């Protein structure tokens, strides 16, 4: 049996990842595939937390740019993450994997409120915990929520699931000579002005010495390879 390199992980999953090739909303086939990948890692004995974005339904920054009050737009974005979290939890149910949703905004009739001790207990008992509503505060991204929850849960790594298979020296879509960084330190990433997470999230991970791995969620088996400690994605470390 494969031995995981990490006992507890915090996976940052963007809302856009749930769209697949659609222009909006939730693509059930894509969700089922992502859930199957997470379930495979969970069966290795890895404790999994997931922070989900909401950009496939509503983006607070975009709403604010169109003239909406920024705080209102951000709260709407948080509610979008709750919808995504519920869709993920239902997909886990269908895959016969126990999962719980905890929301930083209280919606007690629908999902659990975020309670740190309860979340840790769920993870210790093998349940996947999906953290919704970001940090519960406007002006903070779901990247920051992933760094925060990762720190609170004592995760050993934050995994940022993206559309590209790591951090590159340049945009690989524009520059065919772009090279993927296999490993890079926090200080090197800052010095080279690499966009790994947003600045607040990045600073929190750096201060907590919480490593980050940026990888492609659309590459089959990539999540498992990251968890096994193989050369997948880009590892950002202290």
Curated annotation (Swiss-Prot):
InterPro entries hit by this protein: AceGlu_kinase-like_sf, Asp/Glu/Uridylate_kinase, Uridylate_kinase, Uridylate_kinase_bac
EC class name: transferase
Regulation: Inhibited by UTP.
Primary location group: cytoplasm
Binding, UMP: 54, 74, 135-142
GO cellular component, one term: cytosol
E.C. code: 2.7.4.22
Entry annotated with the keyword RNA-binding: no
Residues where ATP binds: 12-15, 55, 59, 162, 168, 171
Pathway(s) served: Pyrimidine metabolism; CTP biosynthesis via de novo pathway; UDP from UMP (UMPK route): step 1/1
SUPFAM superfamilies on file: Carbamate kinase-like
One Pfam family cited in the UniProt record for this chain: AA_kinase
Transmembrane segments: none
CDD domains: AAK_UMPK-PyrH-Ec (cd04254)
Family: Belongs to the UMP kinase family.
PANTHER family on file: URIDYLATE KINASE, URIDYLATE KINASE PUMPKIN, CHLOROPLASTIC
Quaternary organization: Homohexamer.
Protein name: Uridylate kinase
Organism in which the protein naturally occurs: Aromatoleum aromaticum (strain DSM 19018 / LMG 30748 / EbN1) (Azoarcus sp. (strain EbN1))
């Amino acid at each position: 049996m494969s031995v995981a390199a990490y006992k507890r992980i915090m996976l940052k999953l963007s809302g856009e990842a749930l769209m697949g090739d659609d222009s909006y909303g939730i693509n059930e086939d894509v969700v089922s595939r992502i859930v199957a990948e997470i379930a495979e890692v969970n069966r290795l004995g890895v404790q999994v937390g997931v922070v989900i974005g909401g950009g496939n339904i509503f983006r607070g920054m975009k709403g604010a740019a169109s003239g909406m009050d920024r705080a209102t737009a951000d709260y709407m974005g948080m509610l979008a993450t709750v919808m995504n979290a519920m869709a993920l939890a239902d997909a886990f149910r269908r895959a016969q994997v126990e999962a719980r949703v905890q929301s930083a905004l209280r919606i007690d009739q629908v999902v659990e409120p975020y309670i740190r001790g309860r979340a840790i207990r769920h993870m210790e008992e093998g349940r996947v915990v999906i953290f919704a509503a970001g940090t519960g505060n406007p002006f903070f991204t779901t990247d920051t929520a992933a760094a925060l929850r990762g720190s609170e849960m004592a995760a050993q790594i934050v995994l940022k699931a993206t559309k590209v298979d790591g951090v590159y020296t340049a945009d690989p879509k524009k520059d065919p000579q772009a090279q993927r960084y296999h490993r890079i330190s926090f200080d090197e990433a800052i010095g080279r002005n690499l966009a790994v997470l947003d600045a607040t999230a990045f600073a929190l991970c750096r201060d907590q010495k919480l490593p980050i791995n940026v990888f492609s969620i659309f590459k089959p088996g990539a999540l498992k390879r990251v968890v096994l400690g193989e050369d997948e994605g880009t590892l950002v470390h202290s």
